[in-house]
């Protein structure tokens, strides 16, 4: 199954351009949409989830017109929004059972089989009788995935699913998404580079409503590996280096500041070639330093 987005645009009433002629082809498997907050990711997710209208463009899920055939899309869609509410005094089992009825699973035995299976798949079986108000953030996100999987959707959209999760819950959630992505098209929207690096076979970087880069993560890393240089500097030296070089990132490492710069030639001043990562691709692209053709997105 393939999702084709062509020249999708959206401008809000206050003049903010959320999407500017976005064009993407999203194949089966895990696809990462990576960008900072305010890049237009959530607007795109809501349009694809048939919750918001666009101004122009087209979206096709195989041969289904997503913008015109919303009911058909909803029958094969699972959606986990960035923010979603639950009934805090209802148990996980009862609420998932209720959602299953709303999805059309009216036969009690079949519904029980589906609900039981999803709670086990999301590692919530042992807490199925707990009220949702007692769940941690990670448990709530896994419950969100369980409801998104009702109806065996072919397309799943998850918007910023790991924001706010502790490292252990993030690993658990990554494993869950990885299993799901083996059988479906999963569109993952995030500002966390490691989410895409760990999970996605294909990705795109979006900022200010425009797709800047797309491709396979490892291929994008290969495309930048000759241009990344690194060295340690003191905190006092950092502003001067930022003025003289295209510094794309800085971070503390063992109490010292490690900077990465983007340069086509040796920048001198003690810089050494650095092994490029997806972080370098992301930061250089967002900063406007790395501008290859977007290609056939």
State where each predicted segment sits:
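Helix-to-loop junction immediately C-terminal to a conserved catalytic motif
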Residues: 49
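Conserved ABC ATPase "signature" region
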Residues: 97, 101-104, 109-127
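Walker A (P-loop) phosphate-binding loop of ABC-type ATPase nucleotide-binding domains
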Residues: 36-40
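ABC transporter nucleotide-binding domain
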Residues: 173-260
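Conserved ABC transporter NBD signature motif
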Residues: 57-68, 72-73
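Catalytic Walker B motif of ABC-type/P-loop ATPase nucleotide-binding domains
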Residues: 156-160, 165
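Conserved structural motif at the start of ABC-family nucleotide-binding domains
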Residues: 3, 18-19, 74
């Amino acid at each position: 199954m393939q999702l084709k987005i062509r020249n999708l645009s959206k401008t809000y009433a206050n003049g903010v351009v959320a999407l500017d002629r976005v064009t993407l082809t999203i194949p089966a498997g895990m696809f990462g949409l990576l960008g900072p907050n305010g890049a237009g990711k959530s607007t795109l997710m809501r349009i694809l989830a048939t919750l918001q209208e666009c101004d122009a463009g087209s979206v096709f899920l195989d041969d289904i017109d997503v913008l015109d055939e919303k009911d058909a899309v909803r029958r094969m869609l699972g959606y986990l929004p960035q923010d979603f509410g639950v009934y805090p005094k209802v148990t996980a089992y009862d609420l998932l059972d209720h959602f299953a009825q709303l999805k059309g699973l009216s036969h009690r035995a079949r519904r029980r089989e589906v609900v039981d299976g999803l709670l086990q798949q999301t590692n919530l079986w042992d807490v199925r009788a707990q009220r949702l108000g007692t769940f941690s953030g990670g448990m709530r996100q896994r419950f969100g995935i369980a409801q998104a999987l009702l109806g065996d959707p072919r397309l799943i959209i998850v918007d910023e699913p790991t924001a706010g999760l502790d490292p252990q819950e993030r690993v658990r959630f990554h494993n869950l998404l990885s299993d799901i992505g083996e059988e479906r098209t999963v569109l993952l929207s995030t500002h966390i580079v490691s989410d895409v690096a760990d999970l996605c076979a294909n990705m795109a970087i979006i900022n200010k409503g425009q797709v800047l880069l797309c491709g396979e993560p490892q291929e994008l890393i290969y495309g930048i590996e000759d241009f990344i240089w690194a060295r340690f500097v003191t905190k006092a030296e950092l502003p001067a280096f930022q003025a003289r070089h295209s510094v794309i990132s800085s971070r503390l490492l063992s109490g010292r500041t490690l900077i990465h710069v983007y340069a086509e030639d040796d920048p001198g001043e003690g810089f050494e070639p650095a092994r490029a990562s997806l972080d370098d691709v992301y930061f250089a692209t967002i900063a406007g330093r790395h501008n290859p053709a977007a290609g056939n997105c």
